[in-house]
């Protein structure tokens, strides 16, 4: 699993799980579903599919969780769908992350507010990355940022969140740390999910990609892209240990994207408590830690 989890996250999950009542135990999801607010291949899609599979593998769900991709508006299309049409659906989870929380705080989902849904759980932090195509002549993060600093129009950076969303903010954080005076000139192009953004990178439409490790990993394994920086405080362990951090390249930029779920605002207390308990049990399992 490419998420980095914390004790604070686990404590929050267990606190929610402690509220599980006898009534809640009677609820069983009939047709479990997870909405991924982006096209297939991105971090939200990965989160829904991996969590759904793990819940079933652990016996926490006895039915397959259906994953529905609903892209648009940096998560806004999915949010509006849940609020307006699925508000009392007890079987539904929706992939959440820093992006929708940021967009809601910015008032970027017209007519919607954060209290219209029930925030369910965070399952960990997915560190940001900056990547280029495998055959790119750009070797490292400082080289990319120097090109942006010299001529912002020469470099287009693709991401899977809307303008002003988390993928956009990550490249701005790095550019600001490098000394780019007017980060508003950084040329960011938004796509409906990290998978689509990487596709445009491979097509040569853009020169770099900003996203999360979970959505980049498959493209690294296939030899399509190279990660030139991870926005983590220090090098990650295991299979990610070869990826240099921005900080060790002299760019003091850190960006962790929390990932988790929210539920419809009208979900019953019984259903909500059961979902919190299931995700908490998943989080604490050895199987989850090993994936």
Locations of regions flagged by a protein language model:
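Bacterial N-terminal signal peptides that target proteins for export
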Residues: 1-10
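Ligand-binding pocket segment of bilobal, Venus flytrap-like solute-binding proteins
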Residues: 71, 153-154, 159-243
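C-terminal lobe and pocket-closing loops
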Residues: 139, 215-287
């Amino acid at each position: 699993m490419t998420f980095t989890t914390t004790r604070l996250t686990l404590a929050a999950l267990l606190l929610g799980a402690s509220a599980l009542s006898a009534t809640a135990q009677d609820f069983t999801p009939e047709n479990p579903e997870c909405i991924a607010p982006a096209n297939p291949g991105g971090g939200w899609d990965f989160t829904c599919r991996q969590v759904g599979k793990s819940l079933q593998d652990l016996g926490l769900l006895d039915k397959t969780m259906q994953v529905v991709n609903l892209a648009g508006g940096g998560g806004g299309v999915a949010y509006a769908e849940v609020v307006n049409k699925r508000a009392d659906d007890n079987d539904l989870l929706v992939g959440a992350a820093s992006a929708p929380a940021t967009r809601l705080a910015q008032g970027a989902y017209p007519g919607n507010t954060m209290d219209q849904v029930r925030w369910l759980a965070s399952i960990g932090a997915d560190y940001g990355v900056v990547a280029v195509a495998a055959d790119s002549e750009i070797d490292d993060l400082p080289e990319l940022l120097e090109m942006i600093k010299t001529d912002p129009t020469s470099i287009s950076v693709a991401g899977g969140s809307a303008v002003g969303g988390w993928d956009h903010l990550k490249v701005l954080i790095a550019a600001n740390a490098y000394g780019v005076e007017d980060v508003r000139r950084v040329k960011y192009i938004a796509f409906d999910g990290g998978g689509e953004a990487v596709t445009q990178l491979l097509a040569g439409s853009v020169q770099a990609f900003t996203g999360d490790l979970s959505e980049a990993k498959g493209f690294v394994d296939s030899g399509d892209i190279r990660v030139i920086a991870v926005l983590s405080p220090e090098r990650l362990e295991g299979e990610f240990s070869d990826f240099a951090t921005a900080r060790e390249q002299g760019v003091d930029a850190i960006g962790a994207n929390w990932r988790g779920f929210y539920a419809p605002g009208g979900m019953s207390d019984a259903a909500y408590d059961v979902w919190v308990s299931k995700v908490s049990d998943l989080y604490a399992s050895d199987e989850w830690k090993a994936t």
